[in-house]
């Protein structure tokens, strides 16, 4: 997608009042800076909260001076970011010898600067990521490792990266979440806290859609086979 194409995308989004999601700067090249143009256009048109830059891997290759200057503009625009950690760690940096780049955008810095960022997966068992299965808990597990976001505070809040932050990106916060009057769409994980859910790789034990169970799992039963375990 060239510069003219991005102008056209924004023009159409404004005309028809639509959301924008651009696969942007999915490259290790630090000079790939289409996100700068997207940010500028979203500020001019006032559509930042409706605009999402996906991947932005090149932000992981640029120097800090440029990156933190852009953070101010991202926040001013109200831009959303989507990172696909499993795909990006697999696809990016393949041409590097060593040191080898991780290929991820600056998730931690975006998060710490109050910019909306979420995790996703855009490849399901395809050539770009053969192991993709749509399990966002697995994506989150990979993402917080690669982005080095594993302090107690970060792990206590990291489920936001695959829940409320994604809802904000999709502009559905008004119908998302566990609140009276909102659709009952959620999954249940076998954990007592967010930290435990992530740390223990908690299993999904139920899924509810529009108030109806899609599935429920029976509790796992263990049998002690030795005196030590009894």
Regions found by a protein language model. Name each.
Residues 4-52, 56-80, 96-119:
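Histidine/acidic residue-rich metal-binding segments in metalloenzymes
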Residues 24-26, 55-57, 83-87, 119-123, ...:
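Active-site proximal loops enriched in glycine and acidic residues that flank catalytic Cys/His/Asp
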Residues 31-33, 93-94, 129-130, 200, ...:
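Short Asp/Glu-rich motifs
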Residues 40-51, 87-91, 101-189:
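His/Asp/Glu-enriched, well-ordered alpha-helical/loop segment
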Residues 180-230:
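C-terminal cap of metal-dependent C-N hydrolases
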Residues 1:
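Sequence context surrounding c-type heme c attachment/ligation sites in exported
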Residues 29, 61, 128, 196, ...:
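Conserved protein kinase catalytic core
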């Amino acid at each position: 997608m060239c510069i003219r194409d991005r102008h056209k995308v924004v023009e159409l989004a404004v005309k028809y009042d639509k959301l924008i999601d651009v696969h942007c700067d999915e490259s290790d090249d630090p000079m790939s800076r289409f996100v700068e143009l997207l940010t500028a256009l979203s500020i001019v048109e006032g559509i930042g909260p409706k605009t999402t830059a996906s991947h932005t891997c090149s932000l992981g290759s640029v120097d800090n001076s440029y990156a933190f200057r852009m953070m101010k503009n991202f926040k001013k625009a109200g831009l959303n970011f989507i990172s696909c950690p499993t795909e990006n760690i697999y696809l990016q940096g393949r041409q590097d010898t060593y040191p080898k780049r991780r290929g991820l955008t600056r998730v931690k810095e975006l998060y710490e600067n109050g910019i909306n960022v979420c995790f996703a997966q855009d490849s399901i068992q395809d050539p770009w990521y053969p192991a993709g299965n749509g399990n966002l808990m697995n994506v989150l597990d990979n993402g917080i490792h690669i982005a080095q976001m594993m302090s107690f505070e970060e792990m206590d809040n990291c489920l936001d990266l695959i829940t409320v932050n994604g809802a904000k990106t999709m502009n559905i916060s008004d119908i998302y979440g566990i609140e009276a009057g909102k659709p009952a769409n959620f999954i249940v994980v076998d954990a007592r806290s967010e930290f435990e859910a992530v740390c223990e790789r908690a299993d999904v034990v139920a899924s509810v859609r529009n108030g109806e169970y899609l599935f429920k799992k029976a509790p796992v039963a263990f049998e002690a086979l030795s005196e030590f375990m009894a």
